[in-house]
Amino acid sequence: MEEDKTFQSIRISENNNNNNNNNNNNNNNNNNNLNNNNDNDYDYDSINNIEEKFENVSKELEGQSIKFREIDGGKNNNNHDIELGERKPENEEDFKLRQYFEDSQRQKMLINHKPKKMGVSIKNLTVVGQGADNSVIVDNSTPFKALGKLLNPFNYFKKDKNKINTFNILNDINAFIEDGKMLLVLGRPGAGCSTLLRVIANQRESYISVDGDVTYGNIAASDWSKYRGETLYTGEEDIHHPTLTVRETLDFTLKLKTPGNRLPEESKRNFRTKIYELLVSMYGLVNQGDTMVGNEFVRGLSGGERKRITITEAMVSGSSITCWDCSTRGLDAASAYDYAKSLRIMSDTLDKTTIASFYQASDSIYNLFDKVIVLDKGRCIYFGPIGLAKQYFLDLGFDCEPRKSTPDFLTGITNPQERIVKVGFEGRVPETSVDLEDAWKKSQLFQSMKHAQLEYEKQVEQQKPSVDFKEQVLNEKSRTTSKNSEYSSSFYAQTIALTQRQLSLTWGDKFTLTSRFLTILVLSFIFGGIYFQQPLTTDGLFTRGGAIFTSIIFNCILTQGELHGALSGRRILQKHKSYALYRPSAYFVSQILIDIPFILVQVFLHSFIVYFMYGFEYRADKFFIFCFTLVGVSLSSASLFRGFANFTPSLFTAQNLMNFVFIFEVNYFGYSQTPDKMHSWFKWTYYINPLAYAFKSLMINEFKGLDFSCLDSAIPFDHFNNSTYSDMSHRICAVPGSIEGSLSVKGENYLWDALQINSDHRALNVVVIFLFWLFYIGLNLFAVEYFDWTSGGYTHKVYKRGKAPKLNDVEEERNQNQIVKKATDNMKDTLKMRGGLFSWKSISYTVPVAGTNKLLLDDIMGWIKPGQMTALMGSSGAGKTTLLDVLAKRKTMGTVTGESLLNGKQLEIDFERITGYVEQMDVHNPGLTVREALRFSAKLRQEPWVPLKDKYQYVEHVLEMMEMKHLGDALIGTLETGVGISVEERKRLTIGVELVAKPQILFLDEPTSGLDAQSSYNIIKFIRKLADAGMPLVCTIHQPSSVLFEHFDRILLLARGGKTVYFGDIGDKSKTLTSYFERHGVRPCTESENPAEYILEATGAGIHGKTDVNWPEAWKQSSEYQNVVNELDLLRTKEELGKYILDSDLQVDGKQAPPREFANGFLTQFIEVYKRLNIIYYRDVFYTMGSFAQSAVSGLVIGFTFYDLKNSSSDQQQRIFMSWEAMILGVLLIYLVLPMFFIQKEYFKRDTASKYYSWHAFSLSMIAVEIPYVVLSSTLFFIATYWTSGIDSTASANFYYWLMHTMFSVYIVSFAQALGAACVNIAISIAALPIVLFYLFLLCGVQIPPPAMSSFYQDWLYHLNPAKYFLEGLITTVLKPIEVLCTDVDLIKFTAPSGTDCQTYSAPFLQQATGYVVPLSNTTNECGYCIYSSGSDYFETSLGWDYGHRWRNFGIIVAYWGSSILAVLFFVYLTQKPRR
């Protein structure tokens, strides 16, 4: 009974407290419509359109019905919802939104629509993760250590050899939330908030174990997996296709989530249109419908607008339970509140259960929720009504600062540096997370909530909401969707929608399409020119095969870009899979459907050019079979390469696997090595190679039915006396398939004798190619359905060996708290700043848009002085980041006008180096640890005369002050892989990297974005101490609490269009600031109100904010503006400057040091960058060990393919092809090096913007760091290939072969880097790469001998090809010592006339030809001709190569390497600045 009374009192207290917690907030929005400016994410001219659309949607659906709301008239005289508590009155847009949802719900009930009312109950939930001490940074030594453990017999007797240390991410959590209610999850980063939301959303794959019960209504978690998509987890990252527009993004989701039981006579299209217009109006995206979403690399929506798209997409998905994880990141305070209100309205009207974690939630947002749970290091320290949470902790002995919001107070309890203990409670309040959890579990409130949870579960068992829920889920499915399907739409509908989206993505990427088709045109004409009009003679037999080989390989290589495309789309695919939008297999099918038309076009374009230029037979059936076969090659190759991406976790793993398979495809193609020469151990790959079947098919297609003349080349011959061999019956064509006495060779005979190709199997071979395609499709469908290589945003930390901290250990927690406290107390002693006075006047910025200039900043002026902290505010899209970019000299596009001065002088070349810029995007090199990143910044940006020991000591101080001491040896990693530090920790690292440079001025762009309230408070407090130490700062901030806002001295407030609303002092308790707005007719700001929210509301910020005042114009007419103008003029005088910069200018020996662009000289830069790159490469096992494995494996494959070559003439041809294929290693390295270069180039652009190091230091370091890895790769390839193939093993030949091959590999790698430096992105470089590769391979003299080339190619392109000199050196070295001894199979057999012997008959012939003739029998006149007598015969007669040119050729390759180094330097210099 006592518990029942307590429970009842909780409910009453909850409602009353909701009504009284923030009494002074009632009037916060009373004047929402008083003022108007342009500070929104859309034009104010569209407000009337938005209202009209709302009105149209509402009227059409409601039919002027009366709005119904539950009002508690007894206890609340203010007519506010009981469940909402005391909160701001709804404005007009909120009212219309609520009205729309209520009326649509009412009409749906008329058609038997069942509500999906599903609450959530969590009992004894414990989530276990892997301990950090098990997670050691992987490097190149890791495989060897693992192999050592495997080979160590003693390891097999250890009892705990497989033991994994674990820790509890969540510990014994109990909570519940009813349907239609909202639960707020609060906690610092690392508290387990995201894990709790993921587990509620039934995403459990990332954890070792999940114990306890989570029930959805009366459905257990194990059964809830059938309803994937009914619980949604929306993370803080915005993951979208950047090239799709807002309309395309949302319409795609609507297509797949349109319910089957719509209102009568409402079509799918009408439903989608209404919902789309409602949501874009609701989130202020009406005018952005045709704007690309964009990302950090593609221009599109602003950060705030992109966040709204993420929110809108999740809302469209129609889940009954939605988990929002910090979804307000990047939104200003007004927009965040508007978003939270929309959640409240949908929870009320649609019975949605909403569970959300918020960073920096205001009281206005807090009061929208029903319950709150507070977590600390995975332990629940409070769960219950929002109205009782604050009092609970006050009763424990904690105190709350004035104007501090309740959410900030609650999460501040978990931070020893933040919380305040009441007088008299010292030593009595709980200290650690364990203490706080114990206090909670011993409280009466805990028992009451436990009782309330039991009552809720009983109610659920009685009402059985699952019955209506399951019925409605079935009703929402389309008619063609299986009842057992997790999806709302059928597989067919999914495929159609995905195909339309894929078409938009493919067709929208005009740049890549243009690059691809340009490559096809260029190379097709080059191929046609090289193999132009092949003669119908035996001289054209081999080159015809070369032309076919080239076309097949070309169409195969063209599709290799699909690997990168499949990898880049993974995260979007997995997000949509969790939303239950579509099956991954439907996504893959859509890619295939779009592949077909584009591949048809590219194949027919290529075929139309080359087929007729090759001089192939002019027959329509043969032409179309040629095209059809190449279509099969392209389709099967595209699916194969996508398969490598779908079956592997990373780019470099997929690339290595693709290269490995590609080696087999080329070697066992049937061209460079005929089937009869293949060894049994690898010959089976010939039969599973689709390219081999394509080669056979096209060879049959071309050769069948043709006769090839050998009139001029039949042996024996005498070019000086034609009558010598006038008897044609004793002559024969010198090719396989020939018959003595016939001066032509049938194509069918040649195919069988030379290549073992049955000319009757053309159709069969084509069918096999397409069967391979279907097989690859099946493999991919399996992979995309059952493999998920993304982390889903969950991050797992890895550390240097032995450096991992103890997790959730009480003693370790106390130690960390002491370290942070000590560092904070000593901060002033640690920080010694040398600030400057920075001013700007009449700053305007325009960018070219669609042929006109768009003004983004308009006449901005202001200053920052030493010791002052200036806030830069405005709604999303007002131009805050743009202004910071301009002030920090980061803009490389557009036109900037106006004047910026540092200490009264024009900005010097060192400005970017001596200023710190904390950018909004957290860009860090993932291969470094936190400490290494900070030390790198300190070493290269602090002054060179500062001792290294002092720089490192300062780094340690910053680590302590930023609360990152325990993360110093943690790998930064990436969010995509899930290995590394979290989003919040990356933000702190971004700030730390700038602080360790000891800048004179600090620009900070959203330093608290993505941080919790306590971390934000710590950051701002830390920045305040920097200002107090003499550093001038300007900081953009979106959602400052009143406590944070009080740390600033001045504010620059911007309106939409980059116009100034106010610049000046904030004043004590913000009186100076608020009085300015009050003088212009805005209501007074109350004592309990957040001034930051007040000014945003006054200026019409937020999604639907309005104002009647033209604030930019009001500013220009104010006395404050004139004061700013006068002050700027005053700051130019020496007298005024002397007040601020007495010690700020650097002096050396009494003289002012000249400004330096970089702090250190070139040699120091090169050494430090090279050392950093070595660390990164050493830790990138997939890249380095992958390249080693690839070199060894490809070498073994080639070596055993050409195993133990003898001295026959056919084996000489095999030696040539073996040397030709030695270039393959270079090609494989290109495909590995290009992605790595682009990755490092992106980090270089970020570093060079802050003047860490120069472009030539980066270029030369990138070249140098690759050299040892390339040398080792080449050596492994040489060892695996050289002796297995039976090449001359003399020391000189060995050394030359290794040296030449290594030098060529080094050159190829630097050439790949030059290509990467020249191209804007990797897609362009991949598109351009085939031109380079085919130039190297086709015009080197092997596939088509120089005499067979046209003069255009032979006279200059052939001689410019570095591969020509490489192969001349290798082949002449390999063939020079060989004495050719033909086998019986290699001999070309003919008979001498009666009365003569073989030697006599062939004597005139041998005087003009290479080789020798031997009698085959003592009793007959049968002779055998061996085409070569020595290895020199081939390269001297056919190629015109000279053994004496070996070292000349080596020198030429070195020269090519030098030219590629110059190319890298040149192109890096041209592209060093990012486009922004």
Curated annotation (Swiss-Prot):
GO cellular component: membrane
Skewed-composition ranges (Low complexity): 15-39
Top-level taxon of the source organism: Eukaryota
Alphabetical keyword list: ATP-binding, Coiled coil, Membrane, Nucleotide-binding, Repeat, Transmembrane, Transmembrane helix, Transport
InterPro entries: AAA+_ATPase (IPR003593), ABC2_TM (IPR013525), ABC_transporter-like_ATP-bd (IPR003439), ABCG_dom (IPR043926), ABCG_PDR_1 (IPR034001), ABCG_PDR_2 (IPR034003), P-loop_NTPase (IPR027417), PDR_CDR_ABC (IPR010929)
A Pfam family matched in the record: ABC2_membrane
Domain ABC transporter: 151-402, 838-1082
Coarse class of the protein's main subcellular location: membrane
Cellular compartments annotated: Membrane
GO biological process, one term: aggregation involved in sorocarp development
Record region (Disordered): 13-45, 68-91
CDD domains found in the cross-reference section: ABCG_PDR_domain1 (cd03233), ABCG_PDR_domain2 (cd03232)
Record: residues binding ATP: 874-881
GO molecular-function terms, A-Z: ABC-type transporter activity; ATP binding; ATP hydrolysis activity; ATPase-coupled transmembrane transporter activity
SMART domains given in the database record: AAA
Transmembrane segments: 517-537, 547-567, 592-612, 623-643, 764-784, 1182-1202, 1219-1239, 1260-1280, 1298-1318, 1322-1342, 1450-1470
Residue ranges annotated for the ABC transmembrane type-2 domain, each copy included: 507-751, 1182-1405
Residues forming coiled coils: 14-67
Membrane topology: Multi-pass membrane protein
UniProt keyword annotation of Coiled coil present: yes
Family membership noted in the UniProt record: Belongs to the ABC transporter superfamily. ABCG family. PDR (TC 3.A.1.205) subfamily.
Record's protein name: ABC transporter G family member 17
